[in-house]
Amino acid sequence: MNTIKRSLCLAVCATALLAACTKKADKPAVLVPLVNRIDIKTIWSTKVGGERPILRLGLGVAVDGQSVFAASYKGEVLAYQLGTGKLLWQHKLRAPLSAGPAAGDGLLILGSSKGDVIAWSQKDGSPRWRVRINSEILSPAAIGNGLVVVRGVDGKLHGLSAQDGSENWVVDQQVPRLSLRGTSRPTVVGDLALCGFDNGRVLAVTTVTGTTAWDAAVGQSHGSSELQRLIDVDATVVSDGDDLFAVAYQGRVARLTRETGQIIWARDLSSFRGLAVDGNGVYVATAEGDVVRLDRRTGAEQWRLKTLERRQLSAPVVYRGRVVVADLGGIVHWLDAASGAELARHSVGKHRINTPMVVAGDLLLVFGDDGQLSALRAPEFEATTGG
C-alpha cells in the first residue's frame, strides 16, 4: 500500500505541476538581460554527494552556531565551518536519506525513505540513537523542549525524546487518498509544535503531551475532481512574533494568531514552496512562479513579479533587507522588498535549487539538486531618506 501511495503522490505532483506550467506556455519564462545593481560574492562552495533523484526529497542544509550540516540521498553526512567551508567531519550511512538534516541541542537529525529517524552528535558525527516510525519521511524534523518532532507521509506527527528517541506522543491526521509529494516541516515555538497537513489544516499540539491546542483550516477544497481538491499545506508554517503564516496549494495564504490559531486574514493564493516574512510584508512564491508581496497587517497584495513564471522557484527568504528566490537553472534572484524590482542574479550551477535557502548571519546558504552547496554574501540594504 505504501508503494502505491507513493506512486500516486508522485503522479499527482507531476500532473499538478504540468497543469500549472501549461496555463500560458510550456516552457519556463526566458530571463531578460539584467545588469546587477548589487555585488554578490561566492565565499565558498563545495560538493555534497552526487545529483539527487528528481523527487521532492526533504534534504537541505542546517546551521547551528558556526557549523553547517548537509547530507546526500546516498547517505553521506558532512559538517563544515560556516565562515570558511572547511570540512569538519564526514560519515557514510547505509540508508537512503530523504529528509534533513535538522540541528539543535547538540543533535543532528536525519530521516530516511524507510522511516528511520537517526540522531548524531553535532560535534563529531558519532551516533546517538536510531528509531523507525514506519512511514517515509520527506521533511526535516524540529528540535526543541527536549523533543524531536517528526512528520511522516502517513499523516502522523511524532514527538520523540531527544535523549533516546523513545516516543512520547503521536498525533494522527487523516490523509487524503491523493496528495502532492512532500510534507510540511514541523516547527517548535514556545510550548507548541506546529505543522501543516495534506488535508489543508495547520495543527498546534503541546510539546509536553501532544494534546491538540488548536487546528485551523488554511486550505479549502473546491472542484469536482480529486486533483482540483488538492489543498496540501506542504510549506513550513512561519512563526514571527505573535503571528503565524501558512499557505496551501490551491488554497489560501493566512495570518494566524500563535496562541489560538484564529485566522486574522486569508487571501486566495496557491503555493507548495513556501513564504517569508519581515516587519512589513509577506512574500510568497506561487505555484505558477510569481513572487507576491502581501501587506503583513491586512493581507492586501502590494506587488507581483511575473517575469519568473514557470521557473520552479524555491521558497523565498528575506536576506539583508532583500527578498531572494532561486530557480530551476541554479540562478539566485535578488528582489527589492518594497517594489519587487529585480536587483541582481547570481549563478551557483546549472541545476534546480529545490531546497529552502538558509540565512546564517551575513551569509546565504544555497543547496542545489546536484549537491552543490554555496555560501553567498551580498551587502546590507541601506534605506535612503528624503532630505
Pin down the residues of each PLM region.
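Loop/turn-rich, solvent-exposed surfaces of beta-rich toroidal or solenoidal domains
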Residues: 283-293, 300-334
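Short loop/turn segments that connect beta-strands within beta-propeller blades
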Residues: 81-84, 121-124, 161-164, 207-210, ...
